[in-house]
Amino acid sequence: MQKIKRFELKMPKFLLAVEPKRMPNGFHFIYSPHYLSLILVIRERTQQVALNDELVHKPHKLYICNEYEQFKLIIIQNNVKLTGGELAPEISETQFLDEAWQWYNTNMIIQE
């Protein structure tokens, strides 16, 4: 008799969200189904970006990967405070950006 393997399907905390035809290289979106929030990732080595008035006031943080690479993460759609406690624990926007950066750095950046 064949043994059945059980697999627990869990909602991922972060997903890479891409608009392939519209997004130039150096930009990605990260979506969090737990917090119903969207983050824009800007690779600053390849993109020089001046944030408009709307984006300047959104929560953002700069992460330095190494001496050549740095990334700016900006919360574009922010439901972190509204959804905290429902699908995930309550956290600050800075903690949310740090967790998103950790996920992005681990899964999307090729370490050399």
Where is each model-derived feature located?
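Acidic, low-complexity intrinsically disordered segments
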Residues: 84-112
